[in-house]
Amino acid sequence: MAKAKFERNKPHCNIGTIGHVDHGKTSLTAAITKVLAETGGATFTAYDQIDKAPEEKARGITISTAHVEYETANRHYAHVDCPGHADYVKNMITGAAQMDGGILVVSAADGPMPQTREHILLARQVGVPALVVFLNKCDMVDDPELLELVEMEVRELLSKYDFPGDDIPIIKGSALAALENKDPKLGHDAILELMKAVDSYIPQPERPIDQPFLMPVEDVFSISGRGTVVTGRVERGIIKVGEEIEIVGLRDTVKTTCTGVEMFRKLLDQGQAGDNIGALLRGTKREEVERGQVLCKPGSVKPHTKFKAEAYILTKEEGGRHTPFFTNYRPQFYFRTTDVTGVVHLPEGTEMVMPGDNIAMEVHLIVPIAMEEKLRFAIREGGRTVGAGVVASIIE
């Protein structure tokens, strides 16, 4: 069967449902596709189709994720939903499913629960820019004061983790009512109201091509008579021939000029996000550039050695460690294209980290890496992946 053509006429946004187990994330995902299918913006995907999500591998970690797509009048959405709590943790930390925003689902009957808190914290740590709340199962709560109480609790919890709890839209409804065509106010209409909130409150992400230029260095060649060529895939932005760039990471930052861009052996006047290019650098010797550095727009990225991270440590079954590790653990941290040794400092009160845990930790690298918040990395021992992480904040 041929795939339907992906119409690129609307801005695209990646979102996902997060929240405690059994609060209705998957039912809500199904309900959104059902309600939007009426206007031709989606294909109805039933609960059991979403729930048996296929397994995917991201950075050597197996994650089950369901993907649905739909559109509103304003945007095209790719929506991810995970069957299990561990899948959420892995998904958010590896960035396997990039989230420009999230729909936090909270059962009105139960209020915020441990995973509600953990998913909000994870969203904060991994840099999900905005959340919208769907207060689900409102048809099970008769007392309006109780609903208000739950809403207040959710807002307080969001504020505690530095989300704007007072401003975040909270939509009250019932995913089940929408799926079973009952109580349109809590069902059908609430879903439309939720999508309106998602449309307006979750900011449109900046496209990679509009961001400042950055390209991780994969390989370096010397071409006699022409100079040094650096190859890699442009991560974001545009590099034009004649522009000044910086080489950042592993050693002192150097400024140089890009005197040529090649792709498939053809000369171009620019390379852009997604392109695999060779960049010719003026006056740069081959030994001055190495894999693991980045080429970038001057001043846009700085080299750092100390940062706070959120990490997931693989289980033995996932091919990870068989034993716990302690503070001063020294694995390699794989950033973009290279491994750098670093020392792990565990937070106060955390004695050790077991395989299968996710943990906030501080890392001190032995050499600097071009780094910014939200940058993903793998934790490796002798080339074997034992964990995945994301830079939560930079210390120095």
From Swiss-Prot:
Its EC number is 3.6.5.3. Residues 19-26 are annotated as: G1. Keywords: Cytoplasm, Elongation factor, GTP-binding, Hydrolase, Magnesium, Metal-binding, Nucleotide-binding, Protein biosynthesis. Residues 136-139 are annotated as: G4. Residues 10-206 form the tr-type G domain. GTP hydrolase that promotes the GTP-dependent binding of aminoacyl-tRNA to the A-site of ribosomes during protein biosynthesis. This is Elongation factor Tu. The lineage of its organism: Bacteria, Pseudomonadati, Pseudomonadota, Alphaproteobacteria, Hyphomicrobiales.
